[in-house]
Structures are given as structure tokens and as C-alpha cells.
A protein has these predicted regions:
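Residues within mature, well-folded domains
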Residues: 24-167
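Sec-dependent bacterial lipoprotein signal peptides
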Residues: 1-22
Length: 167
């Protein structure tokens, strides 16, 4: 009984931090205009990217991941001229629909960013990889990709987030 108030307090602090992060992201996004903002502007607003992918055309894609606690992953493209050309939140149904059986784990990682959780199942020789996201304005969901022993997609599913505090 003594631990319950502490658990509730920790949950409220975590929720407050998450809401602050979302608000900060919205402010950062509002301050960046495609075709105008520079790489320096992006880094000033979002900090150092977690991952940088070099594209064949000379552009680079910066990943700003909000997993495991958040429900968004941002990918920001900076063109060869140093200007931001795209800012996308990649955890969405359109991107999930691109995940097809046979795709490699690396291809999925590149499309969706770092996941919230990876769970290997030795007996079935499968690995379940989960991304937390919002469906609509406030429905917490998990997009799960199941990989076989060869690290290729077997199947996908979207389910309600069991860790979400729905009231």
C-alpha cells in the first residue's frame, strides 16, 4: 500500500515529461520550414540526430526517435544544398502498409526508425519488434512486425497499446 502512491507519482511525472516532449516537438516543427530551414536550424531545434542515412542523391535523412516512451519517430531530410526538404513523422498507417512479408529487418528499421521494443522467441525462432504510435489524435497503439529466423518479415499487426493509460 505504501508503494502505490510512489508508483502513481512516478507515472504522473512520466506522463508530464511525455506531454512536455510532445509540446516541444510541435514547437520545434513549427519553427522549421521546408526549403528554408538549414541543417544548422534543424540541429538547433532537435539536437544531434540518433541516426543519419546518406541518400544516393547526396541528401541525408536524420532520425529523431521518441521510442520507447513516445509515440512518434521523426525523419528529417536535408538536401545536398544543406536545406531541409522534408520533416515526417514516420509512424503512421501509410508507412505501416509498406511493410511486406520478405522485407529485411534493416529495410523496416530504415522506414520506421528504432523500435520501442524487440522480443525474441527462441522456441518459434521469431522476433517481435514493436513501435508505439497514435492512431488518430489519442488512440495509443502498437505496430508489431514479426521476423523469422532469417530476419525477414513474416507478418505484421496493429493492436491497442497495453501499456497506455486509457481512462
Amino acid at each position: 500500500m505504501n508503494g502505490r502512491p510512489r508508483t502513481v507519482r512516478k507515472a504522473l511525472v512520466a506522463l508530464g515529461m511525455l506531454l512536455a516532449l510532445i509540446g516541444c516537438d510541435n514547437q520545434r516543427i513549427a519553427e522549421l520550414e521546408e526549403g528554408v530551414a538549414s541543417e544548422a536550424d534543424v540541429r538547433a531545434r532537435f539536437g544531434a540526430p540518433e541516426t543519419v542515412w546518406d541518400e544516393p542523391d547526396g541528401s541525408r535523412v536524420f532520425e529523431y526517435n521518441r521510442q520507447p516512451a513516445g509515440q512518434r519517430n521523426y525523419q528529417i531530410t536535408v538536401g545536398p544544398d544543406g536545406r531541409m526538404t522534408a520533416l515526417r513523422q514516420v509512424l503512421n498507417p501509410a508507412n505501416f502498409a509498406k511493410i511486406q512479408p520478405g522485407m529485411t529487418a534493416a529495410q523496416v528499421r530504415r522506414l520506421l526508425g528504432r523500435p520501442a521494443r524487440t522480443t525474441p522467441f527462441a522456441l518459434t525462432r521469431e522476433t517481435h519488434v514493436d513501435w508505439r504510435y497514435l492512431d488518430g489524435p489519442n488512440t495509443a497503439m502498437v505496430f508489431s512486425v514479426v521476423f523469422g529466423a532469417d530476419d525477414r518479415v513474416i507478418r505484421t499487426a496493429s493492436l491497442p497499446d497495453p501499456e497506455a493509460n486509457e481512462h
